[in-house]
Structure formats: structure tokens, C-alpha cells
A protein has these predicted regions:
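Short, composition-biased local secondary-structure segments
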Residues: 1, 18-22, 68-84
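Terminal accessory/targeting
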Residues: 1-54, 86-90, 103-115, 120-240
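Structural motif
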Residues: 40, 96-97
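Substrate-binding cleft of extracellular glycoside hydrolase catalytic domains
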Residues: 53-80, 93, 99
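Acidic beta-strand-to-loop metal/phosphate-binding motif
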Residues: 95-96, 175
Length: 240
């Protein structure tokens, strides 16, 4: 484990089947901010090689086990993990879609070469100081305290700087989604209204929140600004 947890910020992103226009927007934002990000991949995309070759990006897997829970699956959990690992064979980090978790899933992650999992979301509002810890199967579990959609639903009003400066010596891991960065989502109604148009860029862009002070995109920029102003480092979760 490297770095000082009290002075390091970790940024992550779940692609969640975002269209290429939306993914491209996130890549442009990463270039603008010049910060390291781990992106958890859900699907094949023509942008995958561009993402893979980006010097600021590392790739993780984001398997979807929901069809298993809904009895709509034509494969088991091992196959789900195996298929997404074929797309991102180099991945050593994993976060399940919807944070679906079990000992069996963690053990399967490890068997596929995963060393770190990020399935534990404990919001900043809990007041709990987060630390990475070793699961008995051998994985390093890395809890995180911010997720853009959960932040919209919780409506706590806590600022980016409060997350960073009031979390003491604890982990500071943030998670975003390309669609919410694109829309600058400030409430889930905006996302739900835009959701039918995720593959129709000309319609989707009409749903963007243009307020530069409030929303997921604004929050990410504020995280980076506050971190730099207060001399925090930025690093990949793979370096924990």
C-alpha cells in the first residue's frame, strides 16, 4: 500500500453501458482535469483501446449480476465474471453493478486475477472513517464514500471540500458515472427524463444541466480544485 490516506484522493468511474459520445465526453473531462482515474468497464466499445492507452486511466471490471437475481440469466456468476474479464484481461480491480456482493463472488474475482474490490459504499454522511482491509479470501476491500447518483438521492448538501477535509485520516474514494458527468446530474429526475435518449446524442444533450455550480460534473471539478488547493495527491485505487 502506497501513499498517505489522509492526503490522497482516489477517483473512479463506472461506465454503465454509456454510449460512445458520453464516454468520449468523460475522456475529454479527464484530459481537462489531468487526474488519474480507474474506470470500471461494463461492455465492449470502440473507445476501449483509447481508454486503455490513456496514461491517466486504469481499467477495472464492472460485472452485472442483476439478470441472475431477476431469473433472466443464461449464464451463472462465474461466466458473468469470465466474460467481462475477457474484455479487460489486465484488470486487477472490480466493482459489481449495483454493488451485488457475496463471498462466492469475491472468491471468483480472486480466481480471475482481481486483487482489489470496491463493492462497499459507506456514504460520507455516515461519519465513519473508512479504511481498506484484507478480506479472508485475500482481496483488498476498498470502501468508498461518494457516488454521484446516491449523492443526488441523499440530498445531503455536503460539499466536495467537506468530503475531503472532514474525513480525517480515512479513505477518500469518489465514484462517478459518464452519463451523470455528461448531464451534470443534480437530481435523479433529470437522469430519468434523459434515460430514453442515451443513444440519441442530439436529444440527450437537451437534458444537460447547464448550472456550473451544482451537479455531478461540477462536483468532480470541485473535488479536483479543493484537492489541489489543499495539497492533496491524486492516485489510482490500484496503488492502495
Amino acid at each position: 500500500m502506497t501513499g498517505d490516506l489522509s492526503k490522497t484522493i482516489y477517483l473512479t468511474m463506472d461506465t454503465d453501458w454509456a454510449g460512445d459520445d458520453v464516454l468520449s465526453d468523460s475522456l475529454t473531462l479527464i484530459d481537462e482535469l489531468q487526474v488519474p482515474v480507474t474506470i470500471f468497464i461494463t461492455h465492449e466499445t470502440k473507445l476501449l483501446e483509447t481508454i486503455r492507452d490513456h496514461p491517466l486511466i486504469r481499467l477495472g471490471i464492472h460485472p452485472n449480476f442483476y439478470p441472475l437475481l431477476q431469473n433472466h440469466a443464461d449464464q451463472d456468476y462465474l461466466s458473468v465474471i469470465g466474460e467481462i474479464k475477457k474484455i479487460v484481461p489486465e484488470a486487477v480491480s472490480a466493482r459489481s453493478h449495483g454493488l451485488i456482493d457475496s463471498t462466492a463472488i469475491l472468491e471468483a474475482f480472486k480466481a480471475q486475477g482481481i486483487t482489489r474490490d470496491l463493492n462497499l459504499f459507506i456514504p460520507f454522511s455516515s461519519g465513519i472513517e473508512l479504511k481498506p482491509f484484507r478480506h479472508f479470501c485475500g482481496l483488498l476491500r476498498i470502501p468508498y464514500f461518494y457516488e454521484d447518483d446516491a449523492y443526488c438521492s441523499e440530498n445531503s448538501g455536503k460539499t466536495a471540500c467537506e468530503h475531503i477535509l472532514s474525513s480525517g485520516d480515512g479513505l477518500k474514494v469518489f465514484n462517478f458515472h459518464p452519463i451523470h458527468l455528461f448531464l451534470n446530474t443534480e437530481n435523479m429526475n433529470r437522469y430519468l427524463d434523459a434515460k430514453p435518449f442515451q443513444r440519441e446524442y442530439s436529444q440527450l444533450i437537451k437534458h444537460v444541466n447547464r448550472n456550473q455550480q451544482i451537479g455531478a460534473r461540477a462536483f468532480l471539478k470541485q473535488v479536483v480544485e479543493c484537492g489541489r488547493e489543499n495539497y492533496f495527491a491524486f492516485d489510482h485505487v490500484e496503488n492502495l
